[in-house]
Every structure is written in C-alpha cells, then in structure tokens.
Amino acid sequence: MDARLLEILVCPLCKGPLDYLKDKQELVCKADRLAFPIRDGIPVMLEEEARALAAEDVDALR
C-alpha cells in the first residue's frame, strides 16, 4: 500500500481517519466500525464491500 495514498484516504462515510491493517489487507474506520478491503493493492472504499466490526475488534486496535 502506497504511504502517500494512505495519507489522503479517509472513511467515505464519516470522512474520519483510517488505520491500515497490513496483515489483513484492510483499512479500518474506528468511528463507523467498518473494515474496507484492499484487493490487489487497491482499496475498495464502498460501504457495501466493507466488513462490519464488533466493538471488541475496534477496542483491540486502540
């Protein structure tokens, strides 16, 4: 994942910051508790493609 791209990407829903999970190839919005997949190096920033996270999963990221 390109570091410059990570600096400018925000959550498409709340416009908040995203955390990059390299091992899972996901971008996580803690505020909306969503994980957006990265496929073939390309972030898929569509709400319908995002994986919902449990509160415990988000807390583990803090």
From Swiss-Prot:
GO cellular component annotations of the record: cytosol
Gene3D superfamilies xref list: 2.20.25.10
Coiled-coil intervals, chain numbering: none
Cysteine disulfide links: none
UniProt-listed InterPro entries: Trm112-like
Pfam annotation, one family: Trm112p
Family as reported in the entry's similarity comment: Belongs to the UPF0434 family.
Official protein name in the record: UPF0434 protein azo1471
